């Protein structure tokens, strides 16, 4: 496997460029996008929610503080994340980042999937929960690249969350590869422009376009911390097994929600004229 690219924003998008003969599909998840390069495609797996999980946790804290008469600025809570990560131990709690009400779409497709913590004890505090949520983004990235058959040898990052050095370290350790951050803003729009530039002949091929548009804007490689990488390699199988074991639980909860909604609809029929 070569370099791959992940965009860690509200959602998570994980991509690798491969020859069309090397496409590896898992079930009904993922996408394949044609590229303006001979026999090359982009294979993609996406998470319904990435930093939305962090937003949820921080807004829970902000709501609680507001109710007790201590309103807090959300941006200030975001600025505290790296400090909370530094004060907590890696790999103590599992969290599946399925906070979207639409469930998950990569690498599993399950509208009933829901987020949850595993491994809580009375000794855990808010920084431990934040760490578990942030670590889940690394686990989700590893999950998605595993579904594409190979983990990358280098991971290139875009998206707002890539500004956090602590998060970059977690992602590097989770996928077991150095990470590099692109300084280019709006990378998706730039990619569209690059494809158009090749299509109209402004560049002879995609490689020459990449050499000018992408490579000069990449930051230095940040290698994974060995102990953290070992921790996540040990933790990932438990993350995957727990996800599989939870599927019937999600289904039962969804059936309960649907039943409750049906009762509400029956007790509050729509009023209308005949």
Predicted stretch roles:
Residues 1-264, 268:
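Active-site core segments that coordinate phosphate-bearing ligands/cofactors
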């Amino acid at each position: 496997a070569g370099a791959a690219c992940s965009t860690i924003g509200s959602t998570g998008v994980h991509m690798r460029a491969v020859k069309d003969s090397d496409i590896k599909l898992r079930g009904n998840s993922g996408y394949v996008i044609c590229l303006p390069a001979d026999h090359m495609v982009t294979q993609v797996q996406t998470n319904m929610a990435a930093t939305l999980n962090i937003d949820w946790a921080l807004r829970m804290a902000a709501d609680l503080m507001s109710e007790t008469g201590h309103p807090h600025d959300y941006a200030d809570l975001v600025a505290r994340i790296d400090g909370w990560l530094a004060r907590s131990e890696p790999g103590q709690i599992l969290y599946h980042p399925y906070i979207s009400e639409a469930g998950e779409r990569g690498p599993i497709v399950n509208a009933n999937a829901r987020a949850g913590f595993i491994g809580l004890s009375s000794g855990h505090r808010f920084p431990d929960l934040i760490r578990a949520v942030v670590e889940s983004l690394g686990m989700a990235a590893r999950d998605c690249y595993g579904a594409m058959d190979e983990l990358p040898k280098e991971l290139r990052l875009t998206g707002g969350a890539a500004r956090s050095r602590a998060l970059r370290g977690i992602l590097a350790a989770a996928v077991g590869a150095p990470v590099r951050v692109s300084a280019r803003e709006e990378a998706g729009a730039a990619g569209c422009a690059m494809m158009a530039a090749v299509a109209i002949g402004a560049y002879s091929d995609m490689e020459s376009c990449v050499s000018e548009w992408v490579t000069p804007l990449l930051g230095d490689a940040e290698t994974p911390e060995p102990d953290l990488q070992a921790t996540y390699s040990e933790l990932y199988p438990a993350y995957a097994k727990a996800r599989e074991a939870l599927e019937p639980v999600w289904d039962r909860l969804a059936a309960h929600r649907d039943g409750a909604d049906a009762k509400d609809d029956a007790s509050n029929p729509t009023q209308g004229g005949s």
